[in-house]
């Protein structure tokens, strides 16, 4: 066991496939013999008494841990986290998340933390996801939802990550628009400009099993100079 390491997964927007990629990353690391656990510090959007992202991350983890460590804050409405928390009469506390993360690091070799929404999403009145990543001391992996406009969103996000002096350790192209024109050219444009390794390209198919998708990710490239 011992103190594990890990990454923070952010995306170019909400709904770009962060959970899909995080689960695939967990399976990829597990395939190398590591103990892995996914964490969703703040989940917003309850369906039938469950938070789907949290369920998927727990299922993709290969050790059993307390649910409140995987997901310290579970908010019912699928809206911006700080607004959902405010409506519930609570304030998201980064120290609570940090302590939960420490507990996971004691138990797993790799902890992969999935953010809420995009990189600059507020978590309370004075802190955002940037402050959370800094508090956890993690490098960022960027999920680019491949659709028209994604180049701008990806470069803006990369700029924000680096402006906060946080390492950008890799990116994943996740195809979310099957009709996207000049797909390959967009991937190439991002490869040329993001200045971090492309870990893989995930196809458009909502039914893909995360374990199958994991074979499309080259985790050995994480953190390499591109």
UniProtKB/Swiss-Prot annotation:
Gene3D superfamilies: P-loop containing nucleotide triphosphate hydrolases. Keywords: ATP-binding, Biotin biosynthesis, Cytoplasm, Ligase, Magnesium, Metal-binding, Nucleotide-binding. InterPro entries: DTB_synth_BioD, P-loop_NTPase. It catalyses: (7R,8S)-7,8-diammoniononanoate + CO2 + ATP = (4R,5S)-dethiobiotin + ADP + phosphate + 3 H(+). ATP binds at residues 53, 114-117, 174-175. Mg(2+) binds at residues 19, 53, 114. It is an enzyme of class 6 (ligase). Pathway: Cofactor biosynthesis; biotin biosynthesis; biotin from 7,8-diaminononanoate: step 1/2. It comes from the Bacteria. One of its GO terms (molecular function) is ATP binding. Its cofactor is Mg(2+). Its main location: cytoplasm. SUPFAM superfamilies: P-loop containing nucleoside triphosphate hydrolases. Homodimer. NCBIfam families: bioD. This is ATP-dependent dethiobiotin synthetase BioD. It comes from Nitrosospira multiformis (strain ATCC 25196 / NCIMB 11849 / C 71). The gene is bioD.
């Amino acid at each position: 066991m011992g103190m594990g390491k890990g990454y923070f997964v952010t995306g170019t927007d909400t709904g770009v496939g962060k959970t899909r990629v995080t689960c695939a990353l967990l399976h990829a690391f597990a395939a190398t013999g590591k103990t892995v656990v996914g964490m969703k510090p703040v989940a917003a959007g309850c369906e039938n008494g469950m938070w789907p992202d949290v369920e998927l991350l727990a299922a993709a983890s290969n050790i059993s841990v307390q649910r409140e460590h995987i997901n310290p804050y579970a908010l019912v409405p699928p809206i911006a986290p700080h607004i959902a928390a405010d409506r519930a009469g609570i304030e998201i506390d980064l120290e609570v998340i940090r302590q939960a993360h420490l507990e996971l690091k004691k138990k797993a070799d790799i902890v992969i933390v999935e953010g809420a929404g995009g990189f600059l999403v507020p978590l309370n009145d004075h802190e955002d996801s940037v402050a959370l990543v800094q508090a956890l001391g993690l490098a960022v992996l960027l999920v680019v939802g491949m659709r028209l406009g994604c180049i701008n969103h990806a470069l803006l996000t990369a700029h924000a990550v680096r402006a906060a002096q946080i390492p950008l350790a890799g990116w994943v192209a996740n195809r979310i628009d099957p009709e996207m024109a000049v797909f390959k050219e967009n991937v190439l444009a991002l490869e040329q400009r993001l200045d971090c390794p492309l870990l893989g390209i995930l196809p458009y198919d909502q039914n893909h099993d995360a374990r199958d998708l994991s074979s499309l990710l080259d985790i050995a490239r994480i953190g390499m100079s591109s």
